[in-house]
C-alpha cells in the first residue's frame, strides 16, 4: 500500500500539484526555465498559457484535457503532462493526445491545413520499453518526430513527442551536476525533502522553486485543498493497489488451476475490468482508473 506523506514542500510528482505550481502565471519563469532545460534546442523568452481543454473530442462523457498547455514567444505550442503510473497503451495514448490539437488547428483555419509547431513533453514516473536497452542505461529523455527514415528529412513539426522517463533517473542527490538534473530530482523527491539541500541552495533557480513550493507559505484555502487532495490520493491509491493485488492473485490462481498462461492473462483482464467498474461506481476519475488498471479511457467509458 502507498503511504503518502505530507511534508514541508509540495509533492510536484503528482500531476495536479505539478499543474498548480507550474500553471500559475506568477511562476511562469519556473516553467520557462524547466522547458528551456528539457528542450535544449529552444530559447523560450516568454509564453502564454492556453486552455487545456479540447471541445468536441469527448471520450465517452469526458472531455480531453491536458495538464498544461502553453504557447511560446516563437509561436510553438508546448503541452506538458505528468504521468505517475504506466499504462499498457501509453505510447498510443500519447500519439492520440498529440493529434487532438491538430484537429483544432484545422478547424481554426476553416479547412486549411495550417498546422502549428507543437511539442508534447511527458514526465513519466516509470520506464518505457525500447528496442535498444543498452542506450537507455544512462539516458532518460527520448525525442520522437516526423522524419524520413533514411535521410532524417523533417516532414513536419506538428507533432514532436518528448518523454522524460524519471523512472530511469537514478542519480543520488550528491551527484547532481546541473539544474536539469536538480529539476529531475525534485520532480521525484520534492515532497520528501525536509529543507533545500546544500547543493541546490547555490542555484538561484532552485531557491526559487523551493520558495514557491513550501506548504506553509500557501494561502489558507490553497493549503486546505492540498491536504485534502493528498489525503484523497492516499485513500484512492491504497484502494487501487489492493484491487490490483487481488486481481493479480486471482489471475495467477486461475492460471495455475487451468494450467495455461492464457488462463492467468484472462483472469487478470477480468479482474481489471471488475476493478474499473467498482472505481467508476465510486466516482473515481477516468484518468486515475486508467492509470491504475491499464485500461484505456475509451474502454473505461464503455463499461
For each predicted feature, which ranges?
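Elongated, amphipathic alpha-helical interaction scaffolds
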Residues: 1-303
